[in-house]
């Protein structure tokens, strides 16, 4: 089965066919860095990082570009409020962005271009649109002639006639038509600006991504992605600008994730439920946040609340415990294995589970189903561990497959909690407990068992000695 992608442009799933065999060119719209990103912004970051990981797993060389908008009205306001320059504000929150997403185990992009470091390419693209008659200057601003681009609306499914009197169109007397949108903004007194053939100013939001995608990935890219709120007008305008300038298809596949809601309501400052990722990470394990984000298919809305996060924590812990128990058994019982009679049957089951996981991910990156398959793998691992005799080959294959699934999903299976006990600490307590029992100090022996139980360490006294497992 080939990878199937739901293409917003076609409104259906399509088999993925790259522009170049073995290569994926992918652009994801990045944040405007005037503050910490909100928790909703984390969803596309995690989702499309996972998409990238799966392409890599399938053998593709992925060129992944995600930008920083480091100059716009919000940054200018933030700079005034913080009594900093615009570059200082951008530097502060780009640093904060990396601090936060690194905790979520998000892989580094091939490049994270900043708008302010690519102004020549932006100005050149605007100049090309003017030369081709798709843009015009007006009182220091530059606007795109929307009606001249005949395919406008093809991504969002909107007709120009419907947009003519739409609520999202803002009247501006400098425009030749109310549907035209800004490519270049004339500088206001005291604001940061760049020199250009059209006068001092700065770029509009939409032209930035068109110019950056073209510079780093070429005229046509494989996949353009972002949140569903970007379909219109941002991505619609990107298509118009890029295809008007080059005469080529801008992106073959468009992917959009659905919203994250807080207790069933869309997050917004007006509702008072606006939460930054930075604040969420203060009180929650980033590994759990990532697991939570992937527990629902990316095109379905996802709700965040304490109960759902607790469910995610419990689900992730089941995977971690199974992994750690297998790893511990391999590390400590290497001399006790026998050739298990049904080894081939178990290895065949593992092969089937790997195929099921790939089928889940091939189906428009269905991480929700992939996690269900992951849990089935953990369940069978626990069943196998309970057998009297086991095969080292099967145990190692279980461990390898759990690592593989975790790598694709970007999850960490090792226990990273600071209050947990590593294997050597557990072994030391078991030895102390044995000594206490030999000395008939049963109160201390029971106390040690209770300490371990609080850490989810289960002791099993056998004829060969005391074993432990995490449960």
Curated annotation (Swiss-Prot):
Cofactor binding: number and manner: Binds 1 zinc ion per subunit.
Localization of this protein: Cytoplasm
Annotated EC: 6.1.1.16
Entry similarity comment: Belongs to the class-I aminoacyl-tRNA synthetase family.
InterPro entries, sorted: Cys-tRNA-ligase (IPR015803), Cys-tRNA-synt_Ia_DALR (IPR015273), Cys-tRNA/MSH_ligase (IPR024909), Rossmann-like_a/b/a_fold (IPR014729), tRNA-synt_1_cat_dom (IPR032678), tRNAsynth_Ia_anticodon-bd (IPR009080)
This protein's GO CC annotations: cytosol
Annotated binding of Zn(2+), by residue: 29, 209, 234, 238
Short sequence motif named 'KMSKS' region, residue ranges: 266-270
Protein name (Swiss-Prot/TrEMBL): Cysteine--tRNA ligase
Pfam families: DALR_2, tRNA-synt_1e
GO molecular function: ATP binding; cysteine-tRNA ligase activity; zinc ion binding
Motif mapping: 'HIGH' region: 31-41
Biological process terms in GO annotation: cysteinyl-tRNA aminoacylation
